[in-house]
Swiss-Prot record:
GO terms for molecular function: aromatic amino acid transmembrane transporter activity; L-phenylalanine transmembrane transporter activity; L-tryptophan transmembrane transporter activity; L-tyrosine transmembrane transporter activity; thyroid hormone transmembrane transporter activity; transmembrane transporter activity. Residues 15-31 have a biased composition (Pro residues). Belongs to the major facilitator superfamily. Monocarboxylate porter (TC 2.A.1.13) family. It catalyses: L-tryptophan(in) = L-tryptophan(out); L-tyrosine(in) = L-tyrosine(out); L-phenylalanine(in) = L-phenylalanine(out); 3,3',5-triiodo-L-thyronine(out) = 3,3',5-triiodo-L-thyronine(in). Keywords: Cell membrane, Membrane, Transmembrane, Transmembrane helix. The chain crosses the membrane at residues 67-87, 115-135, 143-163, 172-192, 205-225, 236-256, 287-307, 322-342, 344-364, 378-400, 412-432, 444-464. This is Monocarboxylate transporter 10.
Length: 505
């Protein structure tokens, strides 16, 4: 036992060479390769905040719970739609006070200039939508909505301190409107996380929130404007935006996000998440995205100028708030009815509901100058509100049908962004025609033409989608047939193989 020990002590001279071999062994260990694989899973858990079962599923396999916390989210989204579009739809009440506060009787373009305040506000809500869709995909519905409500609150507070139309363009027309845009769009996207089978009904209930506010806000604003004035009224409306901040905290996302295709260790999102070009590959979506803006050049004109038109025709004592209330009541009823009906209309055939709504809205806009009795205006507003609710409530369900749940955020965003141009331009043009012609008659006649044209364009969408599905079905059948032919042996070989043993026998 003592003899081998010196031999081991003498051999270290050749052994240093193998001792260097184990040193590189820790480098090929697969530990660093495992780290980037676990990071997307942690990000999914932090961003989605949902159960493990839903995290493991792809967005295509995800099934919404159809209720639960979704009912709370629905009520929060309803408040969002009400506070955002209720204030916008009631701008006709503030329009009269803006004319008296900032205008002059000697200004020939007074209505044209003042109408830009409301038009900028409504237009910017939709103009910012493509940017909002990117923020919604990157930051989530909750952060985007809460941040937008905070900006809207600041915009209304700042508007309560201005003393001329110039700053009002910025504070009310841009800052407040941008905040509303960031708060509004997530309220539509989050509904797809909780509902699928009842999505049409839920969208009808949510969008009915603007109808409830359109009914009540005109009376509330009239009382506030008479008692406390324009500036304190704007501060009261800022409280609505603060409540909207609290409502946005309920937007807990459930839809799992796909694993990022960016390089491991890179925190930059892929370009496809920032600008999703896949939605533009659908011809049906392209027709939809261009047909709806074409129909909306005259859509916002009655909401801005109808109150002034009533004062000019029926006198300042006319109960003009009743007209907005009629639009709001029937709009809410229409959203509930047509939202439920849309659940039973298969696929993209829901577009025909929008077509009918545009046709009726166009005809009713042309009927406004023909009403020389106040009761006739009430009937026109009732029908206009009913089909206005139809157009609004099925916008999100149609987007889900055309592009799928994973792409719906940017699909709605780009659509609303394209809607901003006609909704911004329409009311100032109507005000310009009034200042030049001395009457709103021509303005309302022209406002009814674009909805008729846009509705006719939308009729092509179901035909285009049906042709696409037939083509896809034919391609899949052809591919499966080729796969079966490649896997099965040729018929001649099988015949030869069966004949050979018979000849041997």
């Amino acid at each position: 036992m003592t003899e081998p020990e010196p031999t081991l002590e003498q051999e270290p001279t050749p052994e240093p060479e193998p001792t260097q071999e184990p040193t590189p062994e820790p480098t090929p260990e697969p530990e660093p390769t495992q780290e980037p694989e676990s990071e997307p899973e942690l990000e999914l858990k932090q961003e989605n905040g949902c159960t493990k079962a839903s995290e493991q599923k792809s967005p295509e396999e995800f099934e919404p719970p159809e209720g639960g916390w979704g009912w709370v989210v629905m009520l929060a989204s309803m408040w969002c739609n009400g506070s955002v579009f209720g204030i916008q739809n009631a701008f006709g009440i503030m329009f009269v006070y803006l004319l008296n506060e900032f205008g002059s009787e000697h200004d020939a373009d007074l209505r044209f200039k003042t109408a830009w305040v409301g038009s900028l506000s409504m237009g910017m809500i939709f103009f910012c939508s493509p940017i909002v869709s990117v923020f919604t995909d990157l930051l989530g519905c909750r952060i985007t909505a809460v941040g937008g409500a905070a900006v809207g609150c600041v915009g209304l507070l700042a508007s309560s301190f201005v003393t001329s139309l110039g700053p009002m363009y910025f504070t009310y027309g841009i800052v407040f409107a941008c905040g509303c845009s960031f708060a509004y769009q997530p309220s539509l996207v989050i509904l797809g996380h909780y509902f699928k089978r009842r999505l049409g009904l839920v969208n009808g209930i949510v969008t009915a929130g603007s109808s409830v506010f359109t009914i009540t806000l005109p009376y509330m604003l009239s009382g506030l404007l008479k008692s406390v004035g324009l500036y304190h009224t704007l501060r009261v409306l800022a409280i609505f935006m603060f409540i909207l901040m609290l409502a946005g905290l309920t937007y807990k996302p459930l839809l799992p996000k796909p694993v990022s295709s960016s390089k491991p260790g890179s925190r930059c999102p892929p370009l496809s998440r920032i600008f999703n070009v896949n939605i533009w590959k659908s011809l049906g979506y392209r027709i939809w995205a261009f047909g709806i803006p074409a129909a909306l050049y005259g859509y916002f004109v009655p909401y801005v100028h109808l109150m002034t038109h009533v004062e000019e025709r029926f006198g300042p004592e006319a109960n003009k708030e009743v007209l907005l209330a009629c639009i709001g009541i029937t709009s809410g009823v229409g959203r509930l009815i047509f939202g439920r009906v849309a659940d039973y209309v298969p696929g993209v055939n829901k577009v025909f509901l929008q077509v009918s709504s545009f046709m009726v809205i166009g005809v009713m806009s042309m009927m406004i100058p023909l009403c020389h009795v106040f009761g006739g205006l009430i009937a026109v507003c009732l029908l206009m509100g009913l089909f206005d609710g139809c157009f609004i409530c099925i916008m999100a369900p149609i987007a889900f049908e055309l592009v799928g749940s994973q792409n719906v955020s940017q699909a709605i965003g780009f659509l609303l962004g394209m809607m901003s141009i006609p909704m911004t331009v329409g009311p100032p043009i109507a005000g310009f025609l009034r200042d030049r012609l001395g009457s709103y008659d021509v303005a309302f006649y022209l406002a009814g033409i674009p909805p008729l044209i846009g509705g006719a364009v939308l009729c092509a969408i179901p035909w285009v989608e049906a042709r696409r599905k037939r083509r896809e079905a034919a391609n899949t059948a052809e591919n499966t047939e080729k796969m079966l032919e490649s896997r099965s042996p040729p018929l001649e070989d099988t015949v030869c193989r069966t004949e050979e043993p018979e000849s041997v026998i």
